[in-house]
Amino acid sequence: MPDPSFFTDEPQLTPLLRKLRSITRLSARDEQAILRLPAHPRVFTAGQDLVSEGDRSTQCWLVLMGWVQRYKLLSGGRRQISAFHVAGDMADLPSLHLPVMDHSLGAVTYVMAASIPHEALRELLERHPDLNAPFWRDTLVDAAIFREWVANVGRRPAYQRLAHLFCELYLKQAAVGLAQDHRCPMPVTQVDLADATGLTSVHINRTLRDLRRDKLIDLRSKTLVIHDWTRLVEAAEFDPTYLQLDRTLAA
C-alpha cells in the first residue's frame, strides 16, 4: 500500500529534483523546466516489471515511491540483481540513447513510477543545455555504483559485502530525505539480498546474524537500524566517494 506521506502538495517530479540536487547544483530556471516535464504516473505491484529485457523503450521511468530492482534472469531462473533504485532515481536513463533494454526493472515493493517520454527529455535538454551536465552526471554516478557492485560481488567476503551494501543503501536514501538517524527502509527479502550480493540465502541469514551479534545493525519489519555507523563503515571498508554525494551526508 502507498505511504500516506507521499500524497503532498509537492510537484510530482520533486523526487527527481532531490536526487539531482544531491549530486550537483541546479539553477531555479532549470528546476522549473524539470518540473514541467510531462510525466504519467503508474502503479506497479511487487514482482511486476516496469520494463523487461528485450523491450524497446520510448520512455524513462522515474521512481516516485517504493523500491525497484535492476536485474537479469539467467538460465534455470537464476537472477542477478545489479542495483536497487529508490524515489528520485531515473532507473533507465540510458534508454534515452540505448532504447533496447539489456536488463529488466522490477518492482520490489508497491511502486509508483512516472514515465517520461524520451522525446520530452530530448526537447528539455535542447532547450536547457545546462541540464545536460546534471543528467550526464547522474548516469556517471550510476556507472560508478555498478563498478562498486562488481568489486563487491567479485572480491569482498560475505560479511564485508553485506555491510558495504547497507552503507550504500542508507546513504542513497539519506541523500533524498528517505532516511535519517541511521535508520532507513529496507524492504528486501533475504533472497533479494542474496541475488544482489552473489551469496546464497543461507549465507545471507548467517551473515545477518553475525552483523547483529557484533551490534552493528538490526534488520526487522523492513527497517534497517545501524547501531554503530563508524564501525559498520570500518567493517565494510566503505568509501562513499563513488556516490558523489554532499560530504555532510557521508560523514
What does each of the following model-derived ranges do?
Residues 1-46, 90, 95-97:
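Cyclic nucleotide-binding regulatory module and flanking cytosolic helices
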Residues 33-34, 51-54, 178:
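Short loop/turn motifs at secondary-structure junctions and domain boundaries
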Residues 48-110:
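Cyclic nucleotide-binding regulatory domains
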Residues 65, 119-120, 191, 230:
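Alpha-helix/helix-capping structural signal
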Residues 83-148:
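Cyclic-nucleotide recognition modules
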Residues 126-198:
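Polybasic "coupling" helices that flank or enter modular domains
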